[in-house]
Structure formats: C-alpha cells, structure tokens
Amino acid sequence: MASGPHSTATAAAAASSAAPSAGGSSSGTTTTTTTTTGGILIGDRLYSEVSLTIDHSLIPEERLSPTPSMQDGLDLPSETDLRILGCELIQAAGILLRLPQVAMATGQVLFHRFFYSKSFVKHSFEIVAMACINLASKIEEAPRRIRDVINVFHHLRQLRGKRTPSPLILDQNYINTKNQVIKAERRVLKELGFCVHVKHPHKIIVMYLQVLECERNQTLVQTAWNYMNDSLRTNVFVRFQPETIACACIYLAARALQIPLPTRPHWFLLFGTTEEEIQEICIETLRLYTRKKPNYELLEKEVEKRKVALQEAKLKAKGLNPDGTPALSTLGGFSPASKPSSPREVKAEEKSPISINVKTVKKEPEDRQQASKSPYNGVRKDSKRSRNSRSASRSRSRTRSRSRSHTPRRHYNNRRSRSGTYSSRSRSRSRSHSESPRRHHNHGSPHLKAKHTRDDLKSSNRHGHKRKKSRSRSQSKSRDHSDAAKKHRHERGHHRDRRERSRSFERSHKSKHHGGSRSGHGRHRR
C-alpha cells in the first residue's frame, strides 16, 4: 500500500456482488472492501487486490504562478534560466556518471517538482541538482556514490569557468559540500512526500509508433526521443500527462521530417489527447531553441542580490539593522539620538539673543521698584531706556577714566567712584522722580546755558572724576537713541546733571567730615 500524498489504492470485490465496495478517490485516500472469501487482509479488513497509482502527481494551475521564487523577488525569466541550467547540469553529470537516460530524466523531473515548492533564492540550485541526480540513481537502480557526484560537478564547474581541470581536494570544504548534498536529498524527499515515482514517455513513444506502423523508421523514433529529452528542461512534465507528452514529441518529429500521419480522424485522438494540449507542449519545447544560453555568473549575482534583500527585510521586520544591531525606534518614546535639526555646538563668539533677553528680564524688577516711587509714568519709560545701556556705559566710563586720570590717587578715586557714584546716582534719580515734578524745558534761554557752563567749570576742579563719569553716561545715553530725539534729551540731561552735581557736591563736602558713613551707605545700597 502506498504512503504518499499522491497515491491512491483501489479495491474490487472478488466474489459476491452483495459485498460492500468503494472506488478510489483522487485525494490520496485508501478504499477498502470486505469479502467472505479469501483475499488480502490489511488491518482488520480483507481486500481482494491493491493497486498503486500516481495519477495526481501534477502541479495544479494555481501553483504555477506565482512560484516561491517569484514571491521572493526573482523574475520569471531568471527562474526559467535557472531551471534550464539545473537540468543541463543534471544531464551533463549523468553522462559523465554513465547513468541511464531514465535516471537523468527522473532527476530533472524531481528538480522541477522541488522548486515549485521551494525558492531558488533560499536553496542553492547546484546543491539541489546534486541531490536530485543522486536520488534518481537510487530510484532507477543505478546508484552512484556522493563522492563521484561531487567530483563530477566540480569538473563541470571548472569547464564552465574555462579553467584547467584539477582534482578536488579532500578538505573541510569537501566535507561541508557532502553534508549539504545529504541534507538537500532529505529535504527533497520531505517536500515531495516521498512520492518520487516518475512515469516517463520513452516506452509510450515506441508503443504509439507501433500502433501507427512507424516503428521501423529509426529516424522518426530517435527524433521523437530527442524532443522528449529537450522538453525535460521545461515544466511540461509537471503539467501534462506522459501520454500527452509522447503524442506531442511524435507530432514535432513527424512535422520536422515531413512524414504524413493520419488526419481523418486525427491520430492523437485515438490516444485521448487534444490538439490544444499538443500545441501548448510544442510551443514550450520550441521556445527553448530561441532562448539565449543562460549566463551562470549573472544568475548567481541576481540570486545573491535577492538573498541579501530578503535577509535585510527579515532583519527590518525584527527591528534590527543589517549588521545585526538593534534599530532605534523613531516613532515614539525617548530616543537618545540627536535630531538632525538641533544645534550640536554653540559658538562662544556669537551672542545669543536669548541671553540678552534674560539679562533685561532680571534687571526689570529693580527698574520697576525705582519707577514705582515716581508719580509720573513718563519718567518710568525714560528710566527703562536708560537702564538698558547702563552696563555698557559703565565699562566704557571706567576705561576712559583710567586712561585720562594721571594722578597718583587713581586707584583711590576709582574705588570712591565705584562705591559712591552708584549710591549717589540711585539716590539722586529716586529723589528727582519723587520730589521734583516733570519740567518743560525752555529751548530759548541762553542765560541758563551760560550759567550752566560756569557752574561746570567751578565744580570740575573739585570733582573732575565724577564729571567725567556723568559725561560718559550722557554720551552713552545719547548714542542709543535716534537722531531725532538726541537734541531734546541732551537738554533734559543738562538740568538733571545740574541737580545731581549740586547734591553730589553737598554730599561730598559732608563726607569729608563723615567719610565712613558715605562708604557704608554705598555698600548698603549696592
């Protein structure tokens, strides 16, 4: 009894018609019949006879396209070239191994069947070809050793590369190849369900020619055999029945040799074959002679490219990089990798506008406290503008005062100016905001301007350093404003400077008698 998925068993009753019987099914099931007379007992049932068939070993139409190789990204012309090249290797190796033609044909049919279940991208066609011819030699009762098969394929590889033939060294590479062939043979058996029987049309061709009374024409017989051997490179042996293939080979040979055959009715109708099937087989066979010879190197590169692409797709599906490292997810979560738009380095020479804004924000509460003491809103706006340029004016006034003063008491004056002028400036401005109302300037009074100049000359001898700092402050204030408001603010600064100088003169005169109180007050205000 058969144990393959493509085998069926049929049983017939031997004696009485009352015995139950069942016909064989096409799905590989075994039918049983019990009889009262003698027969074959299988298990607990008695059978009259058991027949094994493989009528359903053909590939269905839905499996012909797309093939597993096409699903892995290999195009149909490349797959067809690989099938042709694999069958040519099996045929050439069978000749060198002195195998019968039936064994070589069996190996090629097994090769086609296997690659309709597996992909050329995932399995090396050369290793599978070795396994198929080794398995076919055992099936056709002409076994060959694996070492001979490997040596023959090594010799064919050297001839294909136009290299000097050299024997294969028995090293680790040879051992690995031998193990791969053994594993591939086991894989072929598993994929085919151990149903490796192949019905060849060789004998069928001779039988049909005898019916047609053409068996004595050796040229016709040999030509039909040649067409059949060439059709082994195509997929017709896994699509059509061997009887149909035999009729197609006879049809091609008779047309090539211009031998007439019966047409009323057509001779192939006698053997249960249609004209459409014969024409399709003839087209597939004749197409071989119009194709270019397959390029082994280009096919290997194409398969290797698809193999790398398939491996990268698998790693990407697992979330890994091509080198095997885990890929960082950019869809969600925290990523330690910096964004390409974020600045990596901040130059120290460039001044960031954010830092300037932060500095002004920090100084803003002090300005608000000083401006809150004034009952007028207009003074507050001017004080804000003057505070923004105060830091720059301080640095400029210090450098200018150091360069202009040549007295031996320069360091003492600088210290006094740092401690005293800050406190005096803050007190004078706060008092001016709180005590004096907002005054309108008289632009047409030359007597006041002359009086101001005389007071400046008198106070310059006593407080030269303070006058220099006040002038630097007025200059820094005037530089920050536009040209339209420069004249107006300069005149307002004269009145304010006059009041500040008078009060600072009084405080400095008192500080001669009370020096410690002024410095302490300056530290407190700072």
UniProtKB/Swiss-Prot annotation:
Record flagged with keyword Membrane: no
MF GO annotations: cyclin-dependent protein serine/threonine kinase regulator activity
Keyword Transcription regulation: yes
Ranges of compositional bias, category Basic residues: 382-418, 438-452, 460-476, 486-498, 509-526
Residues covered by region (Disordered): 1-36, 318-526
Signal peptide residues on this chain, from the entry's feature table: none
GO cellular-component term (any): cyclin-dependent protein kinase holoenzyme complex
Localization terms from the record: Nucleus speckle; Nucleus, Nucleoplasm
Biased composition regions of type Basic and acidic residues, renumbered to the chain: 342-352, 361-370, 499-508
InterPro entries membership: Cyclin-like_dom (IPR013763), Cyclin-like_sf (IPR036915), Cyclin/Ssn8 (IPR043198), Cyclin_C-dom (IPR004367), Cyclin_N (IPR006671)
Keyword tags: Cyclin, Host-virus interaction, Isopeptide bond, Nucleus, Phosphoprotein, Proto-oncogene, Repeat, Transcription, Transcription regulation, Ubl conjugation
Region Cyclin-like 2, residue ranges: 203-287
Tissues of expression: Widely expressed. Overexpression in primary tumors of head and neck squamous cell carcinomas (HNSCC).
Record location of the Glycyl lysine isopeptide (Lys-Gly) (interchain with G-Cter in SUMO2) cross-link: 339, 347, 362
Span list, region RS: 390-432
Region span, Cyclin-like 1: 88-190
Modified residues (Phosphoserine): 335, 338, 352, 355, 374, 445
Pfam families per UniProt: Cyclin_C, Cyclin_N
One GO-annotated biological process of the protein: regulation of cell cycle
Positions of modified residues (Phosphothreonine): 325
Subunit note: (Microbial infection) Interacts with human herpes virus 1 (HHV-1) transcriptional regulator ICP22. Interacts with POLR2A via its hyperphosphorylated C-terminal domain (CTD). Interacts with CDK11A, CDK12 and CDK13. Isoforms 1 and 2, but not isoform 3, interact with CDK11B. May form a ternary complex with CDK11B and casein kinase II (CKII). Interacts with pre-mRNA-splicing factors, including at least SRSF1, SRSF2 and SRSF7/SLU7.
Additional record remark: CCNL1 is amplified in several HNSCC. May play a critical role in the formation of loco-regional metastases and an unfavorable clinical outcome of HNSCC.
Annotated domain remarks: Contains a RS region (arginine-serine dipeptide repeat) within the C-terminal domain which is the hallmark of the SR family of splicing factors. This region probably plays a role in protein-protein interactions.
Family to which the UniProt record says this protein belongs: Belongs to the cyclin family. Cyclin L subfamily.
UniProt function note: Involved in pre-mRNA splicing. Functions in association with cyclin-dependent kinases (CDKs). Inhibited by the CDK-specific inhibitor CDKN1A/p21. May play a role in the regulation of RNA polymerase II (pol II). May be a candidate proto-oncogene in head and neck squamous cell carcinomas (HNSCC).
Protein name stated in the entry: Cyclin-L1
